């Protein structure tokens, strides 16, 4: 309700980046085991995720033509720094979501990437409405979803190939809550 009431006050949404950071900190608090392999992998995803976002923002090549609003905080190369953490969190959550699936790593990578594309599809209208980003054409192009699929596929192939394993009792609940949050807002925005 608070979000719907404050849609005319975009400065309220500058906290969006803080929620991403808080999600990351909570995940790391309950994450186990901590290992060098885990931290190198997570850092690599963050750095490469940010780099892809920066290239995308500045060229339109990866996801299409878009610009970030102010709600995600401090930017470098017109890209919010929190996008590095966002990629880490999303890949982490989906990786843990499918940890019990005993299937070929390529198929698992494909399914994981599809899940992230569906997540993005549900999140996009809400993110646009909350000034997280704006698309040049008004709505995200197909190019955006293809970009999400390809980038996440590469991340998942890597982490499933190196057999990164961990346990986190919060991750599935956090993913479900985020998905339901964006899904509910998406539905509400269509109704009002």
Residue ranges and their predicted role:
Residues 1-192:
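Aromatic-rich, lipid-facing transmembrane alpha helices and their immediate juxtamembrane interface loops
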């Amino acid at each position: 309700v608070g979000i719907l009431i404050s849609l005319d006050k975009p400065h309220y949404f500058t906290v969006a980046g803080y929620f991403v950071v808080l999600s990351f900190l909570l995940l790391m608090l309950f994450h186990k085991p901590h290992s060098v392999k885990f931290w190198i992998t997570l850092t690599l995803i963050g750095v490469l995720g940010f780099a892809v976002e920066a290239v995308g923002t500045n060229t339109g090549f990866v996801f299409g033509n878009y610009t970030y609003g102010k709600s995600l905080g401090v930017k470098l190369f017109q890209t919010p720094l929190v996008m590095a953490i966002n990629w880490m969190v999303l890949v982490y959550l989906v990786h843990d979501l499918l940890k019990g699936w005993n299937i070929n790593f390529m198929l698992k990578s494909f399914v994981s990437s599809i899940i992230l594309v569906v997540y993005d599809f549900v999140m996009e209208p809400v993110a646009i409405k909350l000034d997280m980003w704006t698309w040049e054409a008004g709505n995200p192009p197909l190019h955006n979803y293809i970009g999400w699929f390809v980038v996440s596929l590469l991340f998942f192939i890597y982490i499933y190939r190196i057999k990164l394993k961990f346990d986190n009792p919060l991750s599935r609940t956090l993913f479900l809550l985020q998905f339901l949050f964006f899904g509910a807002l998406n539905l509400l925005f269509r109704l009002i």
